[in-house]
Amino acid sequence: MRQATGFLEFRTERQGLLDITREVAEWADAQGVREGLLTLFCRHTSASLIVQENAAPAARRDIEAYFARIAPEDAHAYEHDEEGPDDMPAHLRATLTQVQLSIPLIGGRMALGTWQGIYLFEHRRRPHRRTLALHLAGE
């Protein structure tokens, strides 16, 4: 069995979903593994990872709006507010989603469905550099 590890860095410009499918696929392809399991891990507490609809922008807008409703930016609602009104809601949104994904590689390609994409979900308003750790095991 072969293993590969690495990091991918992304610069987010704002809150919302950033499609990172292409960059992840390129990294996995460069490892030369045909059959295996790819794990992605987001090294942050105010960003997360999701697999979601990649064809309809309205679906992404609805997801972003939903999280804005269930974890609103209200400075008076949270005790933890040292970094601004978007800080604690960002932590809550990351908690409600996930910071790691496991995706099978079959025939050298990620086994995503036709309409699935991998998204980095930025929960803070201002730009950030986000780092993902990747691990690929297989043959």
What is each model feature region?
Residues 1-139:
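Active-site histidine-anchored catalytic micro-motif
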